[in-house]
Amino acid sequence: MPRGLELLIAQTILQGFDAQYGRFLEVTSGAQQRFEQADWHAVQQAMKNRIHLYDHHVGLVVEQLRCITNGQSTDAAFLLRVKEHYTRLLPDYPRFEIAESFFNSVYCRLFDHRSLTPERLFIFSSQPERRFRTIPRPLAKDFHPDHGWESLLMRVISDLPLRLRWQNKSRDIHYIVRHLTETLGTDNLAESHLQVANELFYRNKAAWLVGKLITPSGTLPFLLPIHQTDDGELFIDTCLTTTAEASIVFGFARSYFMVYAPLPAALVEWLREILPGKTTAELYMAIGCQKHAKTESYREYLVYLQGCNEQFIEAPGIRGMVMLVFTLPGFDRVFKVIKDKFAPQKEMSAAHVRACYQLVKEHDRVGRMADTQEFENFVLEKRHISPALMALLLQEAAEKITDLGEQIVIRHLYIERRMVPLNIWLEQVEGQQLRDAIEEYGNAIRQLAAANIFPGDMLFKNFGVTRHGRVVFYDYDEICYMTEVNFRDIPPPRYPEDELASEPWYSVSPGDVFPEEFRHWLCADPRIGPLFEEMHADLFRADYWRALQNRIRDGHVEDVYAYRRRQRFSVRYGEMLF
């Protein structure tokens, strides 16, 4: 290769990233208009489009580089010089951390995820100690209650860029002040003030005002979800001021926010104070930088691995028929490998399973489906793998494993947040905890269905319980759109003998689902059955599911809240708003 080509390649990659992030910001900047126009289908499409942008631009850069190099292979020394030139371009670059991830993605695409070493990639950042210079435009604005909290909140709301009319601004402010007074007390509230992010955070059918409530005893989250009535008037649905509530809003089972962030690292640092339980990876994920979140997640995994002497083991729970799942006992992630052969009742291919996981990545997860990160050629040290797990890997996924002596390479896997399997949780809890879990499970099914997702396999083992007690679906191999399912009532038996026969007395076609059958395996436990019948008996009726299908086909997009219904102002303090 001619000398000097290394710099051209480095510049081409960085220019490609500039183009990608420019389009990312362009799509994001349309969130306000989509919200104001209540164009919820455009909201969903924009979310998918933004996710696709990254891989699209990586592909464009790869094609450019193949043209520049005439498709010739490049030796290790050449690639090292490219990385050195790229690193020199980054010290004054405002989004250096994501630019490093983009470089990694281009390299992996060029070399088919092979030779992934710290020398060739930004496994760790080239600027780990970098601090932010003066930000041209502050991320947030401070508001002090010099003339009382009603006046402060009126200024905050009047400062918003939204151009729609408010249904009842004074009422909403009254509700917020009442909530803050109940939370902090009058004296503490008088000594507190707000810091509010300049940009709204858009997701689904809400625009979120995100701020910090700075009190004498510490800083709390201050989150206001802004919704629209059917008449297109704005109202504030609740006020959230605990770290647990904020953590759920920014949770790993929700779609990414659309928030205009030219300096994403600065926004992540600003958010960290009100989301102390979130890792750097989770914060980048929440604002839509999912590919860099993958980089940060891998770094967190490496740091954990370096500091522990644990071995990977099979994950607790009932062994899956499609996925082999393993974990490190002290690490909050699971690693999922598609098996070489599935159980006989699973009539599907590995390609189908991967397509299901991609569907979940792009769809509105409504807080009920765990996000995943996909890896290729994932290297594990054999010394970190328990003998039992190694035997299981070779038995169930040998076609995806390459033995390198002291290491193995797994050709493809997913990493996902670890949860307590719901079936195990239900065995361990009683009383109100059991009731809450069954209520959560039913709510998860309803919210998934409202978002046009049918889980397929609804067994408790396919759901997990988060640290906040939320029930989340995580087994996607049978997932499909609600509109693809034919929900049927079981026809009455023709003769008494029909009910005793080993085969059904009615025809069953692909795509047929009989909700009455759910009762057999959801209500078998005598502790659970009565609770389920009390709270979710309608899930056993085909007409319930068909009514949901009709709403989806009519173009209706349901409201899904990142908080309990009882937290809504309309429920806590007043009559229903509409």
Curated annotation (Swiss-Prot):
Compartments reported by the entry: Cytoplasm
Main location: cytoplasm
Reactions listed under catalytic activity: L-seryl-[isocitrate dehydrogenase] + ATP = O-phospho-L-seryl-[isocitrate dehydrogenase] + ADP + H(+)
Pfam families: AceK_kinase, AceK_regulatory
Binding residues for ATP: 315-321, 336
A Gene Ontology cellular-component term: cytoplasm
Catalytic center residues: 371
Keywords on record: ATP-binding, Cytoplasm, Glyoxylate bypass, Hydrolase, Kinase, Nucleotide-binding, Protein phosphatase, Serine/threonine-protein kinase, Transferase, Tricarboxylic acid cycle
EC number(s) per entry: 2.7.11.5, 3.1.3.-
Source domain of life: Bacteria
GO BP of this protein: glucose metabolic process; glyoxylate cycle; tricarboxylic acid cycle
GO molecular function, one term: phosphoprotein phosphatase activity
Family listed: Belongs to the AceK family.
NCBIfam families the record matches: PRK02946.1 (NF002804)
Function field: Bifunctional enzyme which can phosphorylate or dephosphorylate isocitrate dehydrogenase (IDH) on a specific serine residue. This is a regulatory mechanism which enables bacteria to bypass the Krebs cycle via the glyoxylate shunt in response to the source of carbon. When bacteria are grown on glucose, IDH is fully active and unphosphorylated, but when grown on acetate or ethanol, the activity of IDH declines drastically concomitant with its phosphorylation.
Protein's UniProt name: Isocitrate dehydrogenase kinase/phosphatase
